[in-house]
Structures are given as structure tokens and as C-alpha cells.
């Protein structure tokens, strides 16, 4: 499988890059011009901004699917930390994908979203609900909701992955669809990456367009 990957230098994207390579897939990574990135062997790197339609089209040429692991960045972990990205970054990325992918002959995209986005807020406990709307976290969540709406209005074969609280650590193989997101719900980034690779590789179109992804032993906090 040939996969175009955006956000390959990020926390999730770097794990997906590893998964793709280890499973023998061909990867084209679209990387910002100023980003420090030493590509692993057999990874094709194209330098360009994610909002540059020309760069995106070049990266998508000849691909079978797209893995989108971009997201709004903040200066710190606090909800009110300053934004380092445009407040509508993912909305604009989605619009570009909807425009560019059909012309490149690519239908499938698996995009990183977040637990608590859109209607999944009803699956969240009180603290998570508060955090999802607080400060610039709320800005990012509203942007992701609009990203999903843009994809939903398209004819793409798309899936938005909504992980619960992300943690580091080696893969456990326990990532899967959950129906609640509580204070103590966690999922490892490496497990999310492995699950997303499985989604990218599915032989049939997606039936569900969103999935709340957690650890299958996660409880309700």
C-alpha cells in the first residue's frame, strides 16, 4: 500500500510512520520546510506546508490512501496556552483534501480527531466535558468538528479517529472502539498508530465514519 502521511513528525504521526514501514508499506511524508526531520530508509519526503494545495497534490500523486495526523499546536499543555497554529487549521486542511484527493485519484483518508469532538461529547465524563470546551482546547475541538463536517459532506472514504487521553509507552494491542471517555481513560499513542494502520489497510469502505478509540480495559472515571 502507498500512503501519503501528513504530521509525520508529530507524536502520533511518527508512530504511524514506523508502523507503515515495519509492515512493508510505501510512505510519502509531507513535511514542513522548517521541520527537523531525518527520514528513515525508504521514506519519500516532500517538503511543503499542509495548506499548500500544490505541495499536497504532489504528495498525493500515485497514493492509495492518506493518513492525516495534523492538529492545532499550543505553546503549552494548559488549555489557555497560546495557539501556534491557525485556529481553523484542520478545517482548511479538510477542505484541501476534499478538493485535491479526487483529482489525485485517492479516496481513502484516516484523520486524527479527538475524543469529545462533536456528538462524542455526550460519551464523556464531566471533567472531560469541561476540558474539551476550555480555552484554546475548545478552539481546537471546534476546528476538529468542522474538519469532520467537511469530510462528511464529501464523497471520500473517510474515518475520523477520536482517541481518549493519549499516553506514551510500548504497544499493548488493546486499542479498540469504546463507548465512554472518563477521567482515567487512556490509550497509548503506539496503539492508536497500530489501529490506524489497520484502518488504512481495510479492504472494504468504512461503515462508521468516526470511532471513539480507547484501551479495551478502560473504565469510566
Task: Label each PLM-derived region with a short phrase.
Residues 3-23:
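N-terminal Rossmann NAD(P)H-binding glycine-rich loop of SDR-like oxidoreductase domains
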Residues 4, 28, 159:
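Conserved beta-strand positions in the Rossmann-like core of class I SAM-dependent methyltransferases
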Residues 31, 113, 162-165:
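Conserved SDR Rossmann-fold cofactor-binding beta-strand/turn motif
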Residues 35-92, 96, 100-103, 201:
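NAD(P)H-binding glycine-rich loop region in Rossmannoid oxidoreductase-like domains
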Residues 79, 139-141, 150, 167-221:
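Active-site-lining helix/loop region of Rossmann-like oxidoreductase modules
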Residues 148-169:
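Conserved beta-loop-beta element that borders a ligand/cofactor-binding pocket
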